[in-house]
């Protein structure tokens, strides 16, 4: 297991597995192809290398990011569409070997985060002030509602260099 703090375009070496969680939505759409091409180049050619991308996305065509989210939470973040992601993966030389839409998961995650946040609100208020408390509570609440009632969801996308080399169809290999 290796962690590196650097621009993804500067990563060197080759890897059996690459996992990126909550990262892709911070890549500019003009670099989607570059992102997946870099993953392609970083995966080993041994036939069983896999990349798992876990990203917030929209079921609608690409559109603007919510102004509140852009200003206060994820400045410059993007919410990619399935069509943008698929096109970039195909152009990179990778093959999609698995795609899962986690529709009802993230709103529950946000609800759990909010519950824990509110249990510790007094400590957080001392450390960050009242404005932060209101902002963070609004963020967690509104995003939970957005994931429950709008077009937002989480995609979990598995990509490989060679589809025929996927280590199994049962996904048991993920847990080893």
Predicted region positions:
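A conserved beta-strand element that flanks and buttresses the S-adenosyl-L-methionine
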Residues: 19-24, 52
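Substrate-binding/catalytic lobe of Class I Rossmann-like enzymes that use SAM or dcSAM, i.e.
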Residues: 55-167, 174-176
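A short acidic, Gly/Pro-enriched loop at the edge of an enzyme's catalytic core
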Residues: 5-19, 151
């Amino acid at each position: 297991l290796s962690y590196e703090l650097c621009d993804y375009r500067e990563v060197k070496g080759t890897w059996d597995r690459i996992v990126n969680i909550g990262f892709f939505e911070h890549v500019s759409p003009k670099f989607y192809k570059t992102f997946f091409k870099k993953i392609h180049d970083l995966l080993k050619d041994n036939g069983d290398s896999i990349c798992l991308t876990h990203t917030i996305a929209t079921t609608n065509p690409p559109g603007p990011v919510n102004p509140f989210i852009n200003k206060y939470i994820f400045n410059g973040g993007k919410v990619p569409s399935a069509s943008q992601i698929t096109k970039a993966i195909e152009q990179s030389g990778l093959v999609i070997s698995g795609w899962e839409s986690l529709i009802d998961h993230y709103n529950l995650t946000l609800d759990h985060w909010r519950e824990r946040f509110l249990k510790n609100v007094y400590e957080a208020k001392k450390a960050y002030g009242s404005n932060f408390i209101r902002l963070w509570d609004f963020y967690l609440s509104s995003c939970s509602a957005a994931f429950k009632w709008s077009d937002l969801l989480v995609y979990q996308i598995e990509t490989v260099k060679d589809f025929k080399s996927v280590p199994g169809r049962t996904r048991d290999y993920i847990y080893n």
